[in-house]
Structures are given as C-alpha cells and as structure tokens.
Amino acid sequence: MSATLALTEQLIARASVTPDDQHCQQLMIERLAALGFECETIASHGVTNFWAVKRGTAGREGKLLAFAGHTDVVPTGPLEQWSSPPFVPTHRDGKLYGRGAADMKASLAGFVVAAEEFVAAHPQHRGSIGFLITSDEEGPATDGTVKVVEALAARGERLDYCIVGEPTSTATLGDVVKNGRRGSMSGELVVKGVQGHIAYPHLAKNPIHLLAPALAELAAEQWDEGNEYFPPTTWQVSNLRAGTGATNVIPGHADLLFNFRFSTASTVEGLQARVHAILDKHGLDYALNWSVSGLPFLTPRGELSNALDAAIRAETGLSPELSTTGGTSDGRFIARICPQVIEFGPPNASIHKIDEHIEVRFVEPLKNVYRRVLEQLIA
C-alpha cells in the first residue's frame, strides 16, 4: 500500500464530523514536524486549526506555496444506508469508501506525502511550504480558515501561491480546477402591512400583495452579464412566509429570504443599492438586513495555474478546464492574503452522499500533481 493511500485510510478512520477534528490534525502535524515544519495550533471556540511552515533557503525572501484544506467532514446520514461503516476505510471494486474519502482526506494525505517526497528530494529547496488546515469548513466557517488568515495577516505573513484541496474534478481526475468562486450575499426582507379580517380588505394592508410586483421585478432583473471567468450574477428566493395559517386573516407582514451569487462584475454595494431602489420604487414599508458570507475571488492565468496545468498534464494527459462554478469555499478567505489561489482535488460525484468514495487509481496521481507543483514553483 502506498504511503498516500495508507494516510488517507488513517484519516478516514477518524470520525471528524464538523467541527470535531478527532486528532486528524495531530496526525498531520507529527508528520510535518518530522520534516522540520514549524507547527502552530490556532484554536477558536471549539474549532481546531493549524498553520505549519517550512522555510526554504531563501527565507522570507523566497516564494511561499501553501496547501489549504479541512479535516472536518459532513454527518454520515442514516448509517443503515451505507454499504460499509462510514469511518471504516473499505475497499470495493477499486474504490476506497468512507466519509471524507473524496472531501477531502485523500487531498490532505496527498499534501503531506507530496511534502515528504519533495523535501527528501530537495533538502535545500529555495522556496517555503505552508499548510493551512481547519476543522470548520463544512460548518459555519466562522472559526476556521478565516481565523488563521486573520492571525497570519496580523503578523504580516505573505502567501504567494495556495492550492486548496477541494474535490474539483468531475468525470475524472484533473478535468477541472477552480480558479475562483462567486461571492454569496443574503438578505432578510420584512415587508410590513396591516393585519385584518380577510372579508374587510379595505381595513387592512396585505403585505403579500404589496410585495408581489417588487418580487416579480427582482426575479426578472439582469444584475450583470458576467465576464470571461464568471456567469451572470443570480438572485434567488430561498424562503417566503406570511400569515398565521388561518384562511380568514390578512397577514401583518411578509418575510422573504433571498440570496445573490455574484461575480467580480458586480459589487456588494452596487447590488444592495439596486435592490433598495426597486423596493423603494414600489413604495414598500420594509426592513432589510444583509449578510455577506463571501466575496468573489479570481486567480487569472499565471504561475500557479500554469504549474498546475503542467503537473496535471504530466500525470493524467489532460489539460484542465478553469472553472468558477459551484458554491463558496475557504478560498474566499485565503484570497485576502494570497494573490494566486486555485482549488484542485479528486472527483466530486460522491461527496456528501451515502457511500462516499474515491477511486484508488486516483490517489497516487493526486499526490504526484501536488509534488510536481512544489518542484516547479519552489525547488
């Protein structure tokens, strides 16, 4: 069994349901410390994080490539629906089954073994290697990567490149990498009316009727046209509720929850202003609270994307598609202190599902891609 596969199995065997790390990080830290990494645990409100760095011969003047990822996994769902226990690594039909196999313990193992092989082959490497690992990516993500980024920023730590081990591949290893993600902004809208008997509408104000024209306009609005890297910004309603449940009462207010997934073609301030303008145009009496869970980030083609493309082609024969689709990731936090952030990992078809798995044949090439990028950028 390869070192990468063995470590993947060891990590899967630890039931690290978010935010419980179950000592996965300690296992990684022990391996990294043996290579000469300086390892620092950064805990926050029950979340375990660590930052590890091994300086190259150029010290802080050299480039720093960081691997970023998460040890936490989503809950298993009904255990009886799994073909084998989710935290017992199990091989069937050329696949390794277990919660976190694809998202993202194979990537974590690949990071560690790639670093081990690279340091053994290049003991005098010029650039530096970092690890930024959290147990709060699958949860609220309020005490994880963002806290490490804040700590690094406060001390002036600079990252030049970062690979996030998210499972970006689709049909096969290496067909897709993510060089950016859309931003996410939500709104909680309360439209105020006047409650009353449904038989006497002239004595009440129905907030649903008042909201409906504005809602139709918001749904039809084209917020932007996107750009070379991003599709157009989308606005979607996630929840609409009003009333007491009675059939003879006009509700006193209507509550609407909505979300923007927005590109670098729009700004938070611009989108908010346009929503308020539409609501105001319709004369609504309303309250609106905003929350921004992530800003969009984009890494244009450059040193990191070129190195990753070459490494993937060498291992798989594929030239990966650059994509910004999907939800948010911790890359949105890392982009604050790193100009080049790209996500790459195994196929994602089974993530978060019953019987999550990774094809065993992808484990070594995944590690090799990470090692090749190290060799190209910091050797």
From Swiss-Prot:
Query: What cofactor is needed?
Result: Zn(2+); Co(2+)
Task: Tell me one GO biological process term.
Answer: diaminopimelate biosynthetic process
InterPro entries recorded for this chain? ArgE/DapE_CS (IPR001261), Bact_exopeptidase_dim_dom (IPR036264), DapE_proteobac (IPR005941), Peptidase_M20 (IPR002933), Peptidase_M20_dimer (IPR011650), Peptidase_M20A (IPR050072)
Quote the Gene3D superfamilies the UniProt record gives: Zn peptidases
Q: Which reaction does it catalyse?
A: N-succinyl-(2S,6S)-2,6-diaminopimelate + H2O = (2S,6S)-2,6-diaminopimelate + succinate
Q: List its EC numbers.
A: 3.5.1.18
Residues where Zn(2+) 2 binds: 103, 138, 352
Top-rank EC class of the record's enzyme: hydrolase
What CDD domains does the record point to?
A: M20_DapE_proteobac (cd03891)
For this UniProt record, give its keywords in alphabetical order, as a comma-separated list.
Amino-acid biosynthesis, Cobalt, Diaminopimelate biosynthesis, Hydrolase, Lysine biosynthesis, Metal-binding, Zinc
Example GO molecular function: succinyl-diaminopimelate desuccinylase activity
Please indicate which superkingdom the organism of origin belongs to.
Bacteria
The entry's free-text remark on the cofactor is: Binds 2 Zn(2+) or Co(2+) ions per subunit.
**Pathway note:** Amino-acid biosynthesis; L-lysine biosynthesis via DAP pathway; LL-2,6-diaminopimelate from (S)-tetrahydrodipicolinate (succinylase route): step 3/3
* Any matching Pfam family: Peptidase_M20
Q: Is Lyase included in the keywords of this UniProt record? A: no
Q: Which family does it belong to?
A: Belongs to the peptidase M20A family. DapE subfamily.
HAMAP family per the record? DapE
Q: What does this protein do?
A: Catalyzes the hydrolysis of N-succinyl-L,L-diaminopimelic acid (SDAP), forming succinate and LL-2,6-diaminopimelate (DAP), an intermediate involved in the bacterial biosynthesis of lysine and meso-diaminopimelic acid, an essential component of bacterial cell walls.
The protein here is known as Succinyl-diaminopimelate desuccinylase
Lineage of producing organism: Bacteria, Pseudomonadati, Pseudomonadota, Betaproteobacteria, Burkholderiales
